[in-house]
Amino acid sequence: MLLIIQNGYITPYIYRYLDEDYEIIKSFNVDVTTMDLDKYSVVIILGGYQSVVDINKYSYLLKVIELIKKCLTVKKPLFGICLGFQLIAYALGCEIKSSGKLNVGYDTTILGYDNVFRCHIDYIIPNDSVEVLEYFDNMPYLYKHDNHVYGIQCHPDIAPECIKKYSNHIESYDYAAANKDSINKTNAIIIKYILNLLRDSIKKD
């Protein structure tokens, strides 16, 4: 079973792309440090509106970081998306900075695809704990730590039919409406690809 940590208030849509049972826990309602990690194959840390630059404003995100560190200690496979990508990097000692602008759109190029939604302001400054696998717009967009942690800055978890709940970017609305089938296909492929890498890491251990 997958453990999904929901950090934002919008209902997650990642379930559309999963091939395994899952449990969604809202970090702002539950002390996530109490979760029994032995029940789960992979822990997924989702995005949210918050900024890691101002992490001390969000006491529940400090609990998420504690959970991440616990996962790192026991080598529980971790998958971070957007804010989750930044939270894991922060837990690994990376610096998080603001780009000073909203980076938004569907023209993100990653893993050979060019139709993945992105919507973020902050970005990570990598250290030796993470291996950056891909950059986009001169910012890290995909990294790994050992073989049991992967993070992605963009949003293969957001279904195109739901994009208006996440952004008021008109060009993204129009692109999502015209290309929803191909976007959903890409999202599913990327999510499955990363989850399979993490599952393989369990077998190797």
UniProtKB/Swiss-Prot annotation:
Record-level Gene Ontology MF annotations: transferase activity
Active site: C82 (for gatase activity), H155 (for gatase activity), D157 (for gatase activity)
Top-rank taxon, per record: Viruses
Family matches, as PROSITE patterns: GATASE_TYPE_1
Entry's transmembrane regions: none
Keywords, alphabetical: Glutamine amidotransferase, Transferase
Entry keyword annotation includes Transferase: yes
InterPro entries assigned: ChyE-like, Class_I_gatase-like, GATASE
Glutamine amidotransferase type-1 domain mapped to chain residues: 1-176
Protein's name according to its UniProt entry: Putative glutamine amidotransferase-like protein L716
Organism listed in the record: Acanthamoeba polyphaga mimivirus (APMV)
Taxon lineage: Viruses, Varidnaviria, Bamfordvirae, Nucleocytoviricota, Megaviricetes
